[in-house]
């Protein structure tokens, strides 16, 4: 089933704009749904890299969005894939 990593492009500082990445790998077949959430609500505009595959023919993709970290907001990445019975959510 997909491996999910959620991390920032730059060291996070509250109040300083950053990029939040959701890297999803080790999945097959290639169809996958990736959502990024702020306080449990879907972030409407996220960027997606092209789907790529590894030497073992598993797929990987990177979703990312601009965001500004704060103490009060929580961010997560939710992935839906045929290999899992229900969506998997990983918090940042």
Curated annotation (Swiss-Prot):
Family, as annotated: Belongs to the beta-2-microglobulin family.
Subcellular location: Secreted
Protein name as annotated: Beta-2-microglobulin
InterPro entries named among the record's database cross-references: B2Microglobulin, Ig-like_dom, Ig-like_dom_sf, Ig-like_fold, Ig/MHC_CS, Ig_C1-set, MHC/Immunoglobulin
Organism, as annotated: Mus caroli
Cystine pairings recorded for this chain: 22-77
Alphabetically ordered keywords of this record: Disulfide bond, Immunity, Immunoglobulin domain, MHC I, Secreted
GO biological process, one term: antigen processing and presentation of peptide antigen via MHC class I
Subunit structure, interactors included: Heterodimer of an alpha chain and a beta chain. Beta-2-microglobulin is the beta-chain of major histocompatibility complex class I molecules.
Alphabetical list of SMART domains matching this protein: IGc1
């Amino acid at each position: 089933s997909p491996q999910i990593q959620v991390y920032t492009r730059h060291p996070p500082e509250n109040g300083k704009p950053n990029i939040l990445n959701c890297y999803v790998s080790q999945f097959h077949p290639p169809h996958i749904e990736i959502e990024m959430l702020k306080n449990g609500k879907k972030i409407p505009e996220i960027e997606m890299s092209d789907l790529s595959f590894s030497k073992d023919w598993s797929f990987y993709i990177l979703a990312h969005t601009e965001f500004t970290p704060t103490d009060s907001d929580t961010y997560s990445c939710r992935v839906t894939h045929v290999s899992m019975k229900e969506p998997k959510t990983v918090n940042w």
